[in-house]
Design a protein with these regions (language model features):
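Predominantly long cytosolic amphipathic alpha-helical stalk/bundle segments
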Residues: 31-118, 122-136, 166-215
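Hydrophobic membrane-targeting segments
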Residues: 1-38
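Pore-lining and gate-forming transmembrane alpha-helices of multi-pass membrane transport proteins
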Residues: 140-171
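Alpha-helical transmembrane segments of integral membrane proteins
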Residues: 7-20, 106-113, 159-163
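Residue-level signature of catalytic and energy-coupling elements of molecular machines
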Residues: 4, 18, 53-54, 69, ...
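Short hydrophobic/aromatic-rich motifs at helix boundaries and adjacent loops
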Residues: 10-15, 25-26, 56, 98-101, ...
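Loop-to-transmembrane-helix entry motif
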Residues: 2-7, 94-112, 145, 149-156
């Protein structure tokens, strides 16, 4: 194998990085984190006062946004500042969950070039020890040995550059989600402060909001 045995951990890091990138792409889809119309639907539900615990639990399981809004509804009878504290606490847990595996991806981005450099150094040491034992010999063989040693450096960069790019990309996407989730939570707080009896069901509801019983 060109580059020698240090290529093995680099190949393993490549597989792990690819798996993390694909998993995070699937998990951090917008419709999975911030379902369209969910905030409006929950505000209409809260305004009507139809806050059955069963429906709150159902909301909690829909998405990270649903979990955040459900946390606010759990403590809706408390003062506004306590509701905000609950939202912030649950929000931290949700961010931690959305950032799952990103530290690993960042570590791969940092370790890839170092492993590549290590492989190159090992290859150069082996080559110069061979020269010490048998002399310079053919210059072409010397150039070939240097080229094989540098393969590790190139491989390390090939692993690290995409890992670093997607690490930053996912961090940015999560930061954007956090801003939107905070906005939806504040809007729900305002709705809880000024309940509106008989508010209509939000268009495009997904069955989370219970039907209004007739008088």
């Amino acid at each position: 194998m060109a580059g020698g045995w240090p290529m093995i951990p680099l190949l393993l890091l490549t597989v792990v990085a690819l798996a993390i990138i694909l998993e995070r792409f699937w998990t951090l889809r917008r419709k999975t984190v911030l379902p369209v119309g969910l905030g409006e639907e929950v505000r209409a539900w809260a305004a009507r006062g139809n806050l059955d615990p069963t429906h709150i639990d159902s909301l909690r399981r829909t998405s990270p946004l649903g979990a955040l809004l459900a946390a606010a509804l759990d403590v809706r009878h408390r003062p506004r500042d306590q509701i905000r504290e609950r939202i912030e606490d649950v929000g931290r847990h949700l961010v931690h969950r959305m950032e799952k595996f990103l530290n690993t991806l960042g570590s791969i981005a940092a370790a890839g070039p170092l492993l590549g450099l290590f492989g190159t150094v090992v290859g150069m040491i082996q080559m110069f020890l061979g020269i010490l034992d048998s002399g310079v010999g053919d210059v072409n063989e010397l150039a070939g040995g240097i080229g094989k040693a540098l393969v590790c450096t190139a491989a390390g960069m090939i692993v690290a550059i995409p890992a670093l790019f997607f690490h930053r990309y996912f961090r940015g996407r999560i930061a954007g989600y956090i801003v939107e989730m905070e906005h939806e939570a504040i809007q729900l707080l305002d709705t809880l402060d000024t309940p509106r009896a008989g508010a209509p069901v939000a268009a495009g509801g997904r069955g989370i909001v219970p039907p209004v019983s007739g008088s």
